[in-house]
Regions:
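Conserved acidic residues
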Residues: 31
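FMN-binding flavodoxin-like domain, especially the glycine-rich phosphate-binding loop
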Residues: 22-28, 40-140
Length: 140
């Protein structure tokens, strides 16, 4: 089973979470620019920061994906005030007819976490990716 953990290059808070998730599934976290679109993927996990500005790189990337190469997609993000960007990315995945996993993972950044992500967030991210891998392996 092939699992890819990706994050946007603008995501300074998502990178350590993506790296922890990738270690659990014995792979490496990559930016979306490093993704090999030609190889089929059983589970693609994409992480991003929530911000007030649109992320055209992320939107273009999601629009470029298809069900033949990417069988399942899961999303995770960090947000400050609200998670509107997560809702927009879910909507974009649905409009693009991608196989989006039912559960997504979001965590709220506090002022304390602006320098270092809390260990509880990283542990929860590992549990999330473990659940998604088990779902894909056992049910899809």
């Amino acid at each position: 089973m092939r699992v890819e953990i990706l994050y946007t290059s603008k995501s300074k808070h998502i990178k350590p979470v993506a790296e922890a998730m990738a270690r659990w599934v014995k792979t490496y976290a990559k930016t979306i620019d490093q993704f090999d679109a030609l190889a089929p993927v059983d589970l693609l996990v994409i992480g991003f920061d929530d911000s007030a500005w649109k992320d055209p790189q992320l939107e273009t990337f999601i629009k470029s994906l298809n069900r033949q190469k990417v069988h399942n997609i899961a999303l995770f993000n960090a947000f400050y005030i609200n998670d509107h960007k997560m809702k927009n990315m879910i909507k974009l995945c649905q409009e693009t007819d991608l196989s989006l996993m039912r559960e997504q993972y979001s965590f709220k950044l506090t002022f304390r976490q602006l320098k270092e992500i809390d260990q509880c967030v990283i542990d929860a991210a590992r549990l999330y990716v473990e659940d998604m891998v088990n779902l894909v392996r056992d049910y899809y």
